[in-house]
Amino acid sequence: MKKLLSVMVTILFTSAAASAIDLTSPAFKNNEKIPVKYSCDGENTSPALNFNNIPAGTKQLVLTMHDPDVPKTLLPSGNFDHWFVWDIPANSKGIPEGGGAKMGMNGTGKPGYIGPCPPDRQHRYFFRLYAVDIPLQGKMFKDRAALEDAIKGHILAQSELIGLFDKAKKSGQ
C-alpha cells in the first residue's frame, strides 16, 4: 500500500511539473509595476512576453489580459478585457513588444491591445497563457469569455503573470 501511494504521489508531482508553463516579461516582473510605456499614458503598446515549458500535445497557445479591479459603478462585472490573442503557434517562445497573432475585441470594442488606464487607484492586470490541445485557426471570438468557453476542457497547462499599474503615480518612470 505504501509503495502504491508513493508511486501515485510521484506521478502526480511529475505530471504537475511537466505541465507548468513559464510566462514572463522583460518589461516587468510578476506582481510589479507595468512601465508607463505600455499604458494609455505612454505608447499604449503591448509588452514583450516570453513563454517556456510548453507541454507536449499543445496545438496552440492562447493569451488573455484583463483588469478585475474596475469599479462596479463603471462596469458592473468589474472586469475589463485589455487584450486576448489566439492562434499563437505551439512552438512560439513569446510575443514581441507590440506583437500578437489573432486578436479579439478589447473592452473598448476595438481589436488589439489597450494598455492599463485605471480611473481611480492601482489595478492588477492578469496576463494568462493557456496551452490548448485544439486548433483555433479560422475562428473568431467576440470577447474573452467566448474564447475561454471555446478552450474549456482543452487546456493542457496555464500560467499567469500579474502586472500592477496606478495611473496617478505614473508607474515605471
What are these regions (language model features)?
Residues 18-173:
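N-terminus-centered regions that define maturation/targeting leaders and the start
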Residues 3-15:
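Sec-dependent N-terminal signal peptides
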